[in-house]
Amino acid sequence: MKFGLLGRTLGHSFSPRIHSALGNTNYELFEREPSQLQEFFANPELQGINITIPYKVNALEACDVVDPRAERIGCVNTMVRKDGKWHGYNTDYDGFVFTLQHAGIDVSGKECIILGDGASSATVHVALEDLGAKNIVHLSRKTAPFYGDAPNYYETAQIIINCTPIGMYPHNPANLIDITQFSKLEGVVDLIYNPRRTILLLQAEMMEIPHCDGLPFLVAQGVEAANHFQGESFGTKEIEQILRDMRREKENIILISMPGVGKTTVGKALGEEMGRTCVDVDHELEKEIGAISTYITEQGEPAFREKEAEMIAKFGTQTGLVISTGGGCVTVPKNFAHLRQNGRIYQLTQPVENLSTSGRVLSSGGIERLRELEATRTPMYESFAQCIIEHNRNAPETVAAILEDFEANLL
C-alpha cells in the first residue's frame, strides 16, 4: 500500500515528516501533470493520498464518496481507498480550526476578512461560518471587493486571515495590506509558514494581537489525514509534539548586543551545543568588503550599514541558524523584520566598563564613547529583543539561559 502527497510542483514538503512521526514511513511525494491524474487515481497500489494545489477540485471529482463537509467546501485534500472506492475528506478544515484554538482566537460573532479566493479560502470560509462568524468578506485581486478596498473595513474588521501566497519565501517581506490601520482587530492568521512571521504577523505582534502562522494548520491537517489513513485517533498531543519538534529545528537564534559583549563567543558555543551552523554577520561581511574598520573609514557608516542590511536579509530568510549580528544592526529599522521573520532575538548585556573597543572604529574613544553608544542604542536593542540575557563572560551559563528560554517559547 502506498500513501503520499499529490501536487503539480511540490519541491520541499513537510508532509512526509509529519506522517513519519505518526508511524507511517511509506509516504511519498507524487508530482503529476493534469493529463496524468486519471491514471494516477486508478493506481490500485494507492491507499491514501493528500492533495495540494492545483488538484483539490480534481480530487473531489475523482471520489466515489465525498464527506458532506468537503462537498460543502467544494474541494478535497485527503482521499482514502475503502473497499475499492475513493472516499474524500477536507482535513484543512480541521487544521484551520486547530490553528484558531492554538492562537486563542475566537471568531464567534466577529467581522472577518479573508484575503484570497482559492481553495484554502473556501475552507476557511466554511469553518468561520460553522464557528459563528458574524460576517465574512473576501478581498481579492480578481473580483470586488479588491485588496485596495481594505480601508473600507478599517473600523469594522476584527479578524483577518491571509489565504494567499503573498509574503511567502522567496518573496518575503512582501505584504498585501497594512493591518495597523484596523482599529478593532482582535486576531490575525497567515496560512504561510515560510517565513514563520510574515509582515502581516510582525504587525500583529507589534500590536499585541493574537496571531498565528500556517505551520499549526499544516501539522493539524496532516494529523487528521493520518487518522483517516491509519484508523487512529491522534489529537492535540501529537500535533503539539510534531509542531514543537519542527519549531525547534527551524527557528533561528539571533544575538544582538553592544560591541564587545561576546556575541561571537556565545554564538559559537550555541552552535556547538545545538549542532547548528553559526553565522557571524561581521565575519561574513569581511569576506565581501574586507576589514570593517577600513571600509567605514573609507566609505562611511551609511554605506556599511547598507551592506550589513543586505547580509542580514540574506541570512534572515534561512532557518535553523545561530546568527551573531554586528553591534549597530539595530540602528537600521528594516533589519528587525529580516531577523525576526524566522528567529527569536536575544539581547546580551554586561556592564559597559567590561567592554573592549579594540579594532572597533565606531566605539573607539574609550569608556565615554561606549556610554554614549549604550545610551543611544539600549532602547533600540530592547525594541528588537524578545529576551534579555545577562552575559557575565561565562558562555556555558549564557548558552543554558538562552536554550531554556528558547525551549519555553517554541510554540
Residue ranges and their predicted role:
Residues L131-Y147, D282-I289:
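NAD(P)-binding Rossmann-fold cofactor-contacting core
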Residues K2-A103, P195-R197, L201-Q203, M207-P210, ...:
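Phosphate/diphosphate ligand-binding glycine-rich loop within oxidoreductases
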Residues E240-R248, A269, E273, P379-L411:
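NTP-dependent small-molecule kinase module
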Residues L191-E251, H391:
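Adenosine-phosphate binding glycine-rich loop
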